[in-house]
From Swiss-Prot:
Pfam families assigned: ATP-synt_G
Name the record gives this protein: Probable ATP synthase subunit g 2, mitochondrial
GO molecular function: proton transmembrane transporter activity
Gene: asg-2
Keyword Lipoprotein: no
Domain of life: Eukaryota
């Protein structure tokens, strides 16, 4: 006798269960790898790393100053541009994460001192008189 045909949701449940069992078995190994990579990659540079960092930065500066970018192939230029944009975008993402707000810093209304508010009102009054 043939097995009954499974419905859509039964197929989804079976697939989800199989994925869960596979991921559950792999989790300890993957978590250990993630922890090791995170510990290595997120560590600040050591004292021994600074000479290499300075040498690489000097290479970048000389590359820009001598116009070495003019001799790049289109493919190399696109790769360098993509890497630069990735670094810049991750900087801005890090800024958003750090300030916990997407559009800018949340500044409370009482952050500006009373003397500064008074000076601004005086300047606005002078600007209104000039117009």
């Amino acid at each position: 006798m043939a097995a009954p045909k499974l419905g859509f949701f039964e197929k989804i449940a079976n697939l989800t269960g199989a994925l869960y069992r596979h991921q559950h078995a792999q989790f300890p190994r993957r978590f250990a790898i993630l922890k090791a990579v995170g510990k290595h990659e997120l560590a600040p540079p050591r004292q021994a790393d600074w000479p290499a960092i300075k040498a690489d930065w000097a290479k970048v500066q000389s590359f820009i100053q001598t116009g070495g970018y003019k001799n790049l192939s289109i493919r190399e230029g696109l790769v360098y541009t993509a890497v630069t944009l990735e670094v810049v975008f991750w900087f801005f993402v890090g800024e958003m994460i750090g300030r916990r707000y997407i559009f800018g810093y949340l500044v409370p209304a009482d952050y500006v001192s009373k003397s500064t508010k008074k000076t601004v009102k005086e300047q606005e009054a002078l600007a209104a008189l000039e117009n």
